Design a protein with these regions (language model features):
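A short acidic, Gly/Pro-enriched loop at the edge of an enzyme's catalytic core
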Residues: 125-135
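Short glycine-dipeptide loop
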Residues: 54, 77-78, 160-166
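Conserved beta-strand signature within the Rossmann-like core of class I S-adenosyl-L-methionine
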Residues: 163-175
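C-terminal lobe and adjacent flexible extensions of AdoMet/dcAdoMet transferase-like proteins
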Residues: 239-259
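A short glycine-rich, Lys/Arg-flanked "PGG" loop and its adjoining helix->strand segment in the class I
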Residues: 72, 149-162
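Conserved Class I S-adenosyl-L-methionine
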Residues: 179-203
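Conserved class I S-adenosyl-L-methionine
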Residues: 53-63
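Class I SAM-dependent methyltransferase Rossmann-like catalytic core
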Residues: 20-53
């Protein structure tokens, strides 16, 4: 009986993983986005965080929607996808345009995404207090450093249910001080624990040992941005060819739980 129960349990886990795999293979994802799977490792990353399709999951600042096109369909039938995004009436033109672009994307993909919940990426909670099973942040933390990191971490903590998971990835610095897009992994762990989170562990699935982190324009010289910032105009093509071979940045992948 125990063996049978274990077998059924393994089958259910397998089916759950296959469901996420189906989303990743789906035609609604662009070939350009699928090509980045080798660097962003969405299946392994989300499985490390422990995502389930019946969860309420908040994604912070989805940006261009790379993870949104995975999370929203995956959670469509049994769970709830929540996007914490910029304000429509922000003083920043960039943020207003970002909001408009995301609302258009959600509308254009309604059949695939279902009915995502839109909340403000501001204040001391994202949506309702203790409403989320999981809050995810993909490459946002470097924008918070020195400005609002404690405010954001506190809002994440307030949003999660007890036992809820905070999963985060970002560009990893080899030093404490780095103003070129890379962030201090042990500093983040320290700050999250100070807020009240329990640190569960790290995965190296998004590590990249080829990333030397010494680029004139910072992490943005690497793919996918391939910024020309800081590069000599005469050597842009040569350097970008080099950066493409390096691939996307070296990133930490951390998991925390709200007790």
């Amino acid at each position: 009986m125990k063996k049978f129960t274990l077998y059924i349990g393994l089958m259910l886990v397998s089916l759950g993983a296959q469901s996420l795999e189906d989303v990743l293979k789906s035609d609604h994802r662009s070939d350009k986005n699928k090509a980045r799977d080798v660097y962003r490792n969405p299946l392994e990353t989300l499985n490390f965080f422990g995502i389930k399709n019946n969860m309420t999951v908040v994604e912070l600042n989805p940006g261009g929607g790379w993870y949104q096109e995975i999370l929203a369909p995956y959670l469509k039938n049994k769970g709830q996808y929540v996007t914490a995004t910029y304000d429509a009436d922000s003083d920043s033109e960039y943020r207003r345009n970002s909001y408009k672009a995301e609302m258009k994307r959600l509308k254009d993909n309604k059949k695939v995404y279902g009915e995502p919940l839109v909340v403000r990426l501001s204040g001391d909670v994202y949506g309702e207090k203790e409403s989320a099973d999981m809050v995810l942040s993909f490459r946002n933390y470097h924008n918070w450093i020195g400005k609002s990191e404690f405010e954001k971490l506190r809002a994440i903590y307030n949003t999660l249910k007890p036992g809820g998971v905070f999963g985060i990835t970002d560009h990893r610095s080899d030093t404490i001080e780095d103003k070129k897009g890379y962030t201090c992994e042990p500093c983040l762990i320290r700050d999250a624990e100070a807020i009240g989170f329990r640190y569960i562990g790290a995965s190296q699935i998004n590590a990249n040992p080829r990333d030397t982190k010494d680029y004139p324009g910072g992490v943005w010289n690497l793919p996918p941005t391939l910024s020309e910032r800081g590069l000599d105009k005469k050597s842009i093509k040569k350097m970008q060819k080099k950066y493409k071979l390096i691939g996307e940045s070296d990133r930490y992948t951390l998991k925390f739980v709200k007790p």
